[in-house]
Amino acid sequence: MSPASSWKRKRPSSSSAQASKKRRVYRPAVSRSLARREPLQVQDFVWDTDVAFNRGGGCYLLTSYARGSAENQRKTAETITYKVAVNLGCAISGTMQQYCISSRPVCWIVYDAAPTGSAVTPKDIFGYPEGLVNWPTTWKVARAVSHRFIVKRRWVFTMESNGSRFDRDYTNLPAAIPQSLPVLNKFAKQLGVRTEWKNAEGGDFGDIKSGALYLVMAPANGAVFVARGNVRVYFKSVGNQ
């Protein structure tokens, strides 16, 4: 009979055990819903004519999605706005070109948790006193409506005039070039604004039940201006139809 050492099962060597462990590959399961994620919808607001921002500023609705089947329309009674791209060229108004002035206009993206169905003004949001109407860099959301309005983004830019007009000949009268035509290129992401809609087909102030988003701009130091360009909003229709 062979010795006991010849018929006992031998333990695998450490090198073979390590090789078997290396061969084990674990792959995490990927949800089908994640693999087939739908692209975001896009709503474009094109300002191809002058949009004036006068004393006290202006407020424009960004979550303006009428009901329908197009890419820029909501398909359900609930939407989520994820991103906003602001691409605007601003120009100091002709009436202000005769003055030598430097100003700091402000642009905001503001969330409205409980819209009333009517258009909103910067005064409704910030509640500034009359003495600060030309100083938007000092504006804060009014305490009485702080539960309703939330500033998501805030950008300050520079606008200037050197007292010269565009229609004059300055061949022998050199003048310093001011920042009278500033460009506002901003991109806001991770907004996550959820909007609930009433049982209506439109996409205006009166069609929103809760969760609106506004673009607000205001001139500073009395230097009113106009703007042209494009504001693009990225959103998704969610929930039941």
Swiss-Prot record:
It comes from the Viruses. This is Capsid protein. GO terms for molecular function: DNA binding; structural molecule activity. Encapsidates the viral genome into characteristic twinned ('geminate') particles. Binds the genomic viral ssDNA and shuttles it into and out of the cell nucleus. Plays a role in protection of the genome from degradation, virus acquisition and transmission by insect vectors, infectivity, and systemic movement. The CP of monopartite geminiviruses is absolutely essential for virus movement. Homomultimer. Interacts with the movement protein. Binds to single-stranded and double-stranded viral DNA. Keywords: Capsid protein, DNA-binding, Host nucleus, T=1 icosahedral capsid protein, Viral penetration into host nucleus, Virion, Virus entry into host cell. It holds the Pfam family Gemini_coat. Residues 1-30 are annotated as: Disordered. A motif (Bipartite nuclear localization signal) lies at residues 1-26. It is found in: Virion; Host nucleus. GO terms for biological process: symbiont entry into host cell; viral penetration into host nucleus. GO terms for cellular component: host cell; host cell nucleus; T=1 icosahedral viral capsid. The keyword DNA-binding applies. Belongs to the geminiviridae capsid protein family.
